């Protein structure tokens, strides 16, 4: 079953309080890797749009904007029940990107081909094509396996 982006964000928040921007980037990276590895681990309302600060999910932005502080605590005390595949993607994303700074994650996301295509052709606030995300992250996976 597809999860809400807030469920994914809440999972990352179990590790530590995270800035709004870093949380958006982690969720974008989760979405891309989930699409590449197994479409069943994707997101409800999983559309990310271009912004000056990289890809953002509008429903997550609305939720995050309800917090005055930039660093967000856990949303809920209890985590959603994740499947083994979802945990695999969540843990892989956290172990790969969790220690990186907000600035580094934003740079990684902005430099991703799906973001670049949407931003260069359509500008700000344009949806990033999920199929292009899937293909891009599948190619990244192949590059990692070969290298």
Language model region names:
Residues 1-147:
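Domain-edge interaction signal
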């Amino acid at each position: 079953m597809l999860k809400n982006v807030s469920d994914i964000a809440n999972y990352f928040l179990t590790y530590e309080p995270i800035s709004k921007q870093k949380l958006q980037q982690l969720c974008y990276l989760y979405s891309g890797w989930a699409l590449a590895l197994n479409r069943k681990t994707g997101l409800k309302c999983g559309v990310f749009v271009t912004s000056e600060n990289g890809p953002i999910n509008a429903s997550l932005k609305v939720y995050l904007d309800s917090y005055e502080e930039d660093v967000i605590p856990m949303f809920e005390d209890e985590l959603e029940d994740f499947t083994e595949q979802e945990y695999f993607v969540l843990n892989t994303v956290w172990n790969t990107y969790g220690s990186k700074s907000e600035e580094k994650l934003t740079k990684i996301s902005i430099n991703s081909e799906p973001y670049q295509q949407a931003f260069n052709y359509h500008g700000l606030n344009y949806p990033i094509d999920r199929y292009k995300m899937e293909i891009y992250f599948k190619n990244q996976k192949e590059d990692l396996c070969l290298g």
